[in-house]
């Protein structure tokens, strides 16, 4: 009996769309749900029913059997017949602090029920298991592990001490950069005009040094700046690496952080076998089947590891008719559905 694919993703996610479409084109059954959407109460208007899911969980356990199913919109998902999960989003719906206690309880029970149903998908292949992502989705943990496995890494300091930060910056002969330690991005609408909080990787300038006392408010991540020829994105799918060189040095805005430009040229890159094996071994130790990993290619052709995004994007590196990363993701997921 063929098993089905379950995709956990936000409703508007082109990467989830691409995987779903290609899997179904190959004759497999694929279901989608967004864990971050609130389960609605009964008695909704027609308009509300269009965008809130009709959600119903059935999970039972006896001495003889385990039965689990989920109805989501018009999908009735037999969770005991899921062979693989493609997980892009495992954040759950939350309620504001000002909400009544009844809604807090409802949301807590929604999270616990859906989390439990996902954790009890027996014998299921995950790309990736989100409960394994959380412990390693941290720049400090990744830096430590990269060092342990033998990848080249930049000198790094995490501190909220102005004196320590200043000494570190002054010791970096090629300059220093500052990075956001967390991945959070916040939008403040209180003024009527949305303001985004969070920052790109940036050079610590002379002007920034004048305000270095501000690091005392929270830990900040400093690294030595790495002069580079290009940024290298190594997208790992299972035991395969798809590497691209990004022409980040071709534009002033993207020299330090290529995310500042959206139309940079890229080309496939011959990733060194030894470094590739080291990277794969590190990701396997984390239990990851997918990661988008960022390196610098230095001017003397060394690869320096920066970080791994375990839910990173890849379609921006691929063409409409040539998409080897997408093909490999779908091939790996589909191979788990034919048992």
Regions picked out by a protein language model, each given a short descriptive name:
Residues 2-6:
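Extreme N-terminal starter segment of soluble prokaryotic enzymes
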Residues 266-277, 281-288, 297-339:
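C-terminal active-site "lid" helix and adjoining low-complexity regulatory extension at the edge
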Residues 155, 220-221, 290-293:
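A short linear hydrophobic-aromatic micro-motif
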Residues 10-22, 33-152, 166:
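Conserved N-proximal alpha/beta basic substrate-recognition cap immediately N-terminal to
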Residues 62-64, 73, 236-240, 248, ...:
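Short acidic-glycine loop/turn motifs at beta-strand connectors
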Residues 26-31:
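A generic structural motif
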Residues 23, 170-271, 277:
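Phosphate-binding site of ATP-dependent enzymes
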Residues 149-173:
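Rossmann-like NAD(P)H-binding beta-loop-alpha module
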